[in-house]
UniProtKB/Swiss-Prot annotation:
Residues 1-22 form the signal peptide. The keyword Transcription regulation does not apply. Its main location: secreted. This is Defensin-like protein 71. One of its GO terms (biological process) is defense response to fungus. The keyword Nucleus does not apply. It comes from Arabidopsis thaliana (Mouse-ear cress). InterPro entries: Defensin-like_dom. It is found in: Secreted. Disulfide bonds join C36-C74, C40-C63, C49-C72, C53-C73.
Length: 76
């Protein structure tokens, strides 16, 4: 009985510490991208995103994030 109780408490703590909303921003910030402009699509990919970021004064840009919701993000 004590083992089952410890296991249930462990599972509850582990799931309460997980925050799925934090993952996309950590992916973006992990690569140094500061500013996300728009969502990328089949017609708006890296070849359109990078020049847009450079025009706005950033050094680089690309479609990053979690599939299927990639965003055009710019790097300082």
């Amino acid at each position: 009985m004590a083992m089952t109780q410890v296991f249930v408490i462990f599972i509850l703590l582990a799931t309460s510490l997980c925050n799925s909303n934090a993952l996309p921003s950590s992916v973006i910030n992990g690569f140094g991208y500061d500013y996300c402009i728009v969502e990328c699509s089949i017609t708006f990919l890296d070849d359109a995103c990078k020049p847009l970021c450079i025009d706005r004064g950033y050094s680089d840009g690309g479609c990053i994030g979690l599939s299927p919701h990639f965003k055009c993000c710019c790097k300082k």
